[in-house]
Amino acid sequence: KDNRRKGRSMTGKTHSATGFFAGLVISHYTGCPGAMTLAMATGSVLGGLLPDIDNVHSQIGNRLPVVELIVHGCQRGIRLLSGILPRKLRENVRSMTGHRGLLHSLLVPAAMLLALPVIGNTNGIEKAFLIGMIAGNLSHLILDMLSGGVPLLIPFSVARIRVCNFRTGGIMDKLWRLVMYFG
């Protein structure tokens, strides 16, 4: 399903602005030096856009068609293979592979968090980038909880957790983006 047509998705501009803001806030409060702040801010913008990579309208997919091709190919393959599963399990697997599925759960930021110790012996730039990715990703999930909901608890539940239902391009979306740009 394409939630954008229904007006239930935040825009990529809003996600990238909020991710950027989240990265800057974390950088400020952790006292990151200049290069690490840049890495964290860059990671947070990418992290803010990453969950929508499974959407045909994603900013990342539109700029890097090969990434979109790989993601959608994997989705189709999983959906095809799920055809051999019992109906209820098949429906759950298919709901996890569509937009606002697995990539909109807490599994992704948890996996990134688990990767932090692996890159712990680097010069700090990579770590700052990954922390930014986590911040941007979490900001994306929070925003999408305001616009249709997200299945945060996959694989335990595919139920969407929603706080309210702002519309794409609506006044709240635009106002929020303005606050993030100038906040």
Model-identified regions with their sequence ranges:
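N-terminal membrane-targeting hydrophobic helices
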Residues: 2-183
